[in-house]
Amino acid sequence: TRTDHPSGSDRVFEAIETIDPDRRFTQILNLQGDLPDLSPEIPHLLGATLDRGETDLATLVTPASAEEAARPQVVKAVVSWQDADFGTALYFSRAAIPTGTTALFHHIGVYGWRRDALARFVALPPSPLEQAEKLEQLRALEAGMTIAIGKIDTAPGGIDTAEDLEAARMRAAAAHHKD
């Protein structure tokens, strides 16, 4: 794909248009390379969240620890919950929001897109909030798109810093030596 895309979702759209010009696939899952510990259940839950309601795209969250809440590399999601495991996104931020006694949720950077919604998304320029927070999903929210949220128990290990990369290498080496 081109190297000048403003977001991963823009890159995914280019890839799916190249791979599937006949548009056989109507849903696209965008799984991030910086989440090497993604469990096999994640794509299934992401697809189920996308299928659950009238929504443009879906993503996942998990309860945030106090340490995660304080880290700007951990994106927090504000969610309007419809039940214990399903809701709609209201906002995403690198800040610890919402304040108060409400539980904080760690956004997992995976997306399930309806193909038509992804096409609408990539036709939009990066939005002011997207540029301020450096979070692509804010472009969708600012455009009035609906983001369904599924809840998982724990976050997969992500790589946001050099320390995260070293920890991932150690996990991979330990797993390799088990085999």
Where are each of the predicted segments found?
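Short phosphate-binding loop-to-helix
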Residues: 1-31, 37-45
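One-carbon transfer enzymes
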Residues: 1-7, 72-74, 169
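A short acidic, often aromatic-flanked loop/helix-cap motif at beta-alpha or helix-coil junctions
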Residues: 4-9, 66-67, 156-158
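Residue-level signal for alpha-helix termini/capping positions
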Residues: 17-21, 51, 173
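Short, high-confidence coil segments that cap the C-terminus of an alpha-helix
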Residues: 23-25, 52-56, 145
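Short beta-strand segments
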Residues: 30-32, 60-61
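Conserved core of the sugar-phosphate nucleotidyltransferase
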Residues: 38-127
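Conserved alpha/beta core of the MobA/IspD/sugar-nucleotide pyrophosphorylase nucleotidyltransferase superfamily
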Residues: 102-179
